């Protein structure tokens, strides 16, 4: 077979590659040099490689164009990267315990974690930034916890989690997206697994009428659950439209099965579309129930005797769909086939007619179903009419034109596939710059590959993931960077750096540590001046200031068995002068950044002298920033 024929087969999806496949760098370099089908010289190869490196190089002292926010998967955190350099800037602990900052240990963080502080794990997949009029407003980032059915909110001005909500009466919050217009009023999140209601151990049959899962909406400001909608089948991924009326979610288990074979039995599953305005009307009219001890209004969105609910419509699509993505032009919900080589294009402007009963068949809203390759999982967009879909089995990203795919669905002979690019290996999510908004700029794309195999130095049986940066600014995709990541990012999101406004030091009136300020006020303490010990029966509260390189208290005395709370206020006013506090041999560690108040509580269970020290290098005399706790025997 000639090179020309091979290229043709790749574009039309006829060729089936091996697992490792051809080098993506080779393909990109050839394309960049204009030598498709030819032989590269040493000079042309070097020129292409140099061009790729120049694209992503951010010189010392210069700043990246974008903030990237990566989910940490079952590590439980959010990671902040600069794009295009792919340099890691910060880690934001959310559902995990972090000994550097004290997240999960400090009283402030445990107050935010609430009753779920007992969980030491999390599984976060989908980070999304709040919006106004379909554009990022940089106020919040939201993320799910599949492991313990939670949703968290991160304040982007301080890059700290400030609210965590447990979703009641469901299991495994997976897909998460935000209302885009007029602003992010709701955080929409899918509960993946079907459970009995009540889930009290008396019923285990998933076929039971009272076994179901629910679609959930969380108020973005209060972080209270606003409503839940019962659905047929299960829920996977979700997204919202650009009108504020519709959201949609994929279902891969319409069979309500619990085994692999059962979940793949049906040739078609569905996308369920929610009319959010109709849900709100049902609740306002009092047509809802509540479940168990929860006061959250629950609307039934299941079909009854073949008749649709007023709040949902079920659109059949090929089997076991996974990703659900809204095109940046607001025209389509794209459902990614997973076990089908296709993506289904749902025309959002036809949904009002579907809900009004003007269409004979729910499939009438499907206006395109392009065949793309094996294992399509997620789709992103460049704002120029092109979509980019990950092909998990083929280990590729495929670029295709949406309007041409729609024309092909009508029978026109048109090649909607523009390029297939090898990635390394088995990509899941992918994300283009600003692609969740109406401002998609078509510059960069990240393919989050699940396997790295031979791409990096070996690290034992556990390998890093591979997040690959792809230049999509031109007509041809070019792979420009491999980025190893620790387990296991699922998705990422990119915003322009001007859209994120961060504080340099803390505001003394910040609500993050308001409960600690209130406690100090009750004790008659001025946190910015006082260095005192308050004794309250068996409880001891130690208040101190800190200014590098010294604590306001260099020693304090307690009794064995006392519950000790140490409260420290960092009085430095220079950015980046963070202090730490570690009590040796007590499992105590926390960060106190400039103008922040932090506190931590522990039991002084060992008599004797115990040193505490500053764990952050805040000063040349950082080693001398110490103190001692003297514990008298009981």
Curated annotation (Swiss-Prot):
Cu cation Z2 binds at residues 125, 174. Cu cation Z3 binds at residues 126, 429. It catalyses: N2 + 2 Fe(III)-[cytochrome c] + H2O = nitrous oxide + 2 Fe(II)-[cytochrome c] + 2 H(+). Keywords: Calcium, Copper, Metal-binding, Oxidoreductase, Periplasm, Signal. PROSITE patterns: COX2, COX2_CUA, TAT. GO terms for cellular component: membrane; periplasmic space. It comes from the Bacteria. Residues 538-634 are annotated as: COX2-like. Cu cation A2 binds at residues 614, 616, 618, 622. GO terms for biological process: denitrification pathway. Residues 1-49 form the signal peptide. Its cofactor is Ca(2+); Cu cation. Binds 2 calcium ions per subunit. Binds 6 Cu cations per subunit. Each subunit contains 2 copper centers; Cu(A) (binuclear) and Cu(Z) (tetranuclear). Cu(Z) is thought to be the site of nitrous oxide reduction. Cu cation A1 binds at residues 579, 614, 618, 625. Pathway: Nitrogen metabolism; nitrate reduction (denitrification); dinitrogen from nitrate: step 4/4. Its EC number is 1.7.2.4. Ca(2+) 2 binds at residues 252, 255, 263, 269, 320. Predicted to be exported by the Tat system. The position of the signal peptide cleavage has not been experimentally proven. Homodimer. Nitrous-oxide reductase is part of a bacterial respiratory system which is activated under anaerobic conditions in the presence of nitrate or nitrous oxide. This is Nitrous-oxide reductase. The gene is nosZ.
